Amino acid sequence: MQLNSTEISDLIKQRIEQFEVVSEARNEGTIVAVSDGIIRVHGLADVMQGEMIELPGNRYAIALNLERDSVGAVVMGPYADLAEGQKVKTTGRILEVPVGRGLLGRVVNTLGQPIDGKGPIDNDGFSPVEVIAPGVIERKSVDQPVQTGYKAVDSMIPIGRGQRELVIGDRQTGKTALAIDAIINQKDSGIKCVYVAVGQKASTIANVVRKLEEHGALANTVVVVATASEAAALQYLAPYSGCSMGEYFRDRGEDALIVYDDLSKQAVAYRQISLLLKRPPGREAYPGDVFYLHSRLLERASRVNAEYVEKFTNGEVKGQTGSLTALPIIETQAGDVSAFVPTNVISITDGQIFLETDLFNSGLRPAVNPGISVSRVGGAAQTKIIKKLSGGIRTALAQYRELAAFSQFASDLDDATRAQLEHGERVTELMKQKQYAPMSVADQSVSIFAAEKGYLKGVELNKIGDFEASLLSYMNSEHADLMKTINETGDYNADIEGGLKAGLDKFVETQTW
């Protein structure tokens, strides 16, 4: 066989032309130090702030400190088997979590991975955990209510859709109970809920999930969990993950409610990370950007206008506004609301609900102190009937607390003062409410109407609860149409007032409590 040199050269040329250089450019570095969940990496170039760094064993760390010759990163998960000299590489990605309707009814960790044993989640995509909040032009004023189901809150400290209302108090004052009841009350309202548990015991969270399931609210709720035993990085990021899951509904013209339980533990986790990264400590050893930690999170709770929703959905959803309402929880130490983190969050939010240990221990539950609790924007969103009827409730309670303190020193009181004290006592008693028993707008309206129009005057203090229960049972059976109208419209006019008065007059005649 004779070889033709021309054919050989043509074949070689053809092979050379077809040859493709396949090269993978990887930004790789070496771990130079590992301690307490923090790794220091040398040799990485082009790293972004907050970028995910791939570690051995299919784990990730997040780059938080970008220094001249090294990168400080916090490990997302266990770190005991990491060692100096191991290779790591950049991913070019910022941390993202799954979002969508498939998360409703599920319990997930900070990274959006299911931990409830119900199989994989059918998500609609991914969203970055850190998102810039909507601007001023994209927002709409708050004018629709979020009913918590608590008389004390809905009448005196109303919450609107898109508002940030802080729940603050010492440990064991009913903060979580109030937030969980608010979630339970949304099961028929169309508001989707996200409950973020930060730094709590796994048994406590399991109990919350069980209660939500028992009351039919879990199907409407996403539970995001970062327990006390998990890495500080996961506790720090959990609220941001939950917020991204809630924003999915807001940006599509729906309403969502998110509870952060609690942001004190998130601040402690962030302080731990910052100190380990050797960032300079400030007041109470918190880093200088702890205000920004919470402000950038809570500013994402907002009501957005129809133009924003239409633009976000590429015209699929038109003429609908969306909202994300936040109920951040802060735990105080011995009632000290002037500590660093509480004052920060008070200044960021649109109002606060103060829960007091003394009130809780005296049997007043929810233990709301109406004197120092406030809602800065909720008044514009309050249901008409409750707004009209509850005007005197806050005044009555404030005057009662003042007079009760004064009457301890005064021996004889005039009739007007005594009447005020008695009215205040009855209103205080009426504001008591059992856990897991949120009330409808109509039920609240009937109770407040009875207090405002003097129907409690002849009722003994220890019978107020029985009086209310019997009254609501009577009104819902004998005046079902009136109650249905109030629930559907929320209006207050002469017909509704006449119907309530007639119903109460007839009930009082029966003396069946």
UniProtKB/Swiss-Prot annotation:
UniProt topology in membrane: Peripheral membrane protein
CDD domains: ATP-synt_F1_alpha_C (cd18113), ATP-synt_F1_alpha_N (cd18116), F1-ATPase_alpha_CD (cd01132)
Positions of the record's site feature: Required for activity: 373
Stretches that traverse the bilayer: none
GO cellular component: plasma membrane; proton-transporting ATP synthase complex
Binding site for ATP: 169-176
EC number assigned by the record: 7.1.2.2
Alphabetized SUPFAM superfamilies for the sequence: C-terminal domain of alpha and beta subunits of F1 ATP synthase (SSF47917), N-terminal domain of alpha and beta subunits of F1 ATP synthase (SSF50615), P-loop containing nucleoside triphosphate hydrolases (SSF52540)
Keywords in alphabetical order: ATP synthesis, ATP-binding, Cell inner membrane, Cell membrane, CF(1), Hydrogen ion transport, Ion transport, Membrane, Nucleotide-binding, Translocase, Transport
InterPro entries, per database record: ATP_synth_asu-like_sf, ATP_synth_asu_C, ATP_synth_asu_C_sf, ATP_synth_F1_a_nt-bd_dom, ATP_synth_F1_asu, ATPase_a/bsu_AS, ATPase_F1/V1/A1_a/bsu_N, ATPase_F1/V1/A1_a/bsu_N_sf
Compartments, as annotated in UniProt: Cell inner membrane
Catalytic activity: ATP + H2O + 4 H(+)(in) = ADP + phosphate + 5 H(+)(out)
MF terms (GO), sorted A to Z: ADP binding; ATP binding; proton-transporting ATP synthase activity, rotational mechanism
Quaternary state and interactors: F-type ATPases have 2 components, CF(1) - the catalytic core - and CF(0) - the membrane proton channel. CF(1) has five subunits: alpha(3), beta(3), gamma(1), delta(1), epsilon(1). CF(0) has three main subunits: a(1), b(2) and c(9-12). The alpha and beta chains form an alternating ring which encloses part of the gamma chain. CF(1) is attached to CF(0) by a central stalk formed by the gamma and epsilon chains, while a peripheral stalk is formed by the delta and b chains.
HAMAP family: ATP_synth_alpha_bact
Similarity comment: Belongs to the ATPase alpha/beta chains family.
Function: Produces ATP from ADP in the presence of a proton gradient across the membrane. The alpha chain is a regulatory subunit.
Protein name, as recorded: ATP synthase subunit alpha
